[in-house]
């Protein structure tokens, strides 16, 4: 498991450029990065007028995820004052960093650890890959689920901010907005929410990821390496069963199937530091859903995060599940597989 690090923005003196430099250093040293917005806490050094004036700190207000309720027929909310700009980082720069942090957070998920290993061994910087991925989904000419999710993240990261505490409370007190808050449509932890939404459409996310590898870095890839990339994509798109866990359809008992690859990606990934050349051969694998595992996880998620617990959508339930149980490892989401030859 890779080490984790946390970055707070915008600290005094931070710029968009220095933030990206920090992200580059950490990502290229296999450190998983989480980005958090600076809270201007009452009594803390950076919540006092002296620091606010000294560093030109600009504030907005947002609701804390799940910190609200209706008590004695009175809607109550906990909102926080956060910093969204300083004399060295504009509000626009802050949003650029905040929105890019979603891509960084998504790629930090252990499901994409094999992609990290692949990219590294193709002599592609993990940071540069993340920037190319971001540039691709920002391009008006590109379409896909990841682009849609990124755009929705950008919209929510802007709309969650209010100029005053009173403005935030007034907005969430409206019945239709309070209902959206209850349903998790607004006011959620955006990183967890959109990571979950992304993993629920994992095949389409992988399509975009491998599109970027093959298109944006094609000048770095040999013919053999293109075959390796294609085999990697094929394997990862067949490996996980997240769709089955959160689906309603009954899993049929006889669900075995086989895939053939030009490169033995599963064996290569399982080794620590073996070169590509030892695994560049035809390989066949048999995969199938572990029905007991699917049923167990369906029941577990339903019992903990079912609709009677306030989780009205699969992505919301999955987001909470990921945050609390990802330490078990991503193999809980994998199908059973065995090598045939």
What residue spans do the PLM features occupy?
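A structural motif corresponding to the C-terminal lobe/cap of the Radical SAM core domain
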Residues: 1-129, 133, 252, 258-286, ...
């Amino acid at each position: 498991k890779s080490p984790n690090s946390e970055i707070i923005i915008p600290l005094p003196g931070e710029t968009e450029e220095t933030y990206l430099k920090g992200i580059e250093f950490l990502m290229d040293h296999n450190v998983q990065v989480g980005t958090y917005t600076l809270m201007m806490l009452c009594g803390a050094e950076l919540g006092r007028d002296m620091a606010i004036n000294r560093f030109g700190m600009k504030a907005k207000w947002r609701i804390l995820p799940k910190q609200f309720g209706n008590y004695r027929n009175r809607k109550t909310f906990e909102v926080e004052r956060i910093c969204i700009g300083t004399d060295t980082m504009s509000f626009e720069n802050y949003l650029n960093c905040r929105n890019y942090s979603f891509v960084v957070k998504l790629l930090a998920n252990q499901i994409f650890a094999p992609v990290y290993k692949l990219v590294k061994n193709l002599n592609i910087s993990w940071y540069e890959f993340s920037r190319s991925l971001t540039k691709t989904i920002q391009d008006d000419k590109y379409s896909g689920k990841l682009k849609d999710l990124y755009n929705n993240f950008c919209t929510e990261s802007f709309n969650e901010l209010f100029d005053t505490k009173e403005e935030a409370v007034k907005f969430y007190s409206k019945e239709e907005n309070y209902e959206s808050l209850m349903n998790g449509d607004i006011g959620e932890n955006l990183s967890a929410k959109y990571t979950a939404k992304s993993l629920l459409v994992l095949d389409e996310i992988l399509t975009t990821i491998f599109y970027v590898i093959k298109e944006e870095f094609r000048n770095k890839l040999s013919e053999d390496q293109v075959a390796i990339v294609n085999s990697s994509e094929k394997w990862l798109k067949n490996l996980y069963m997240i769709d089955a866990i959160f689906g309603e359809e009954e899993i049929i008992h006889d669900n075995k199937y086989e895939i053939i690859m030009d490169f033995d990606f599963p064996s290569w990934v399982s080794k620590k530091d073996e070169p590509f050349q030892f695994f560049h051969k035809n390989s066949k694998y048999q995969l199938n859903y572990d029905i007991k595992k699917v049923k167990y996880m369906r029941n577990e998620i339903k019992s903990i995060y079912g609709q009677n617990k306030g989780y009205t959508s699969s992505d919301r339930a999955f987001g909470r599940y990921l945050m609390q149980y990802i330490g078990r490892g991503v193999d809980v989401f994998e199908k059973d597989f065995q090598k045939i030859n």
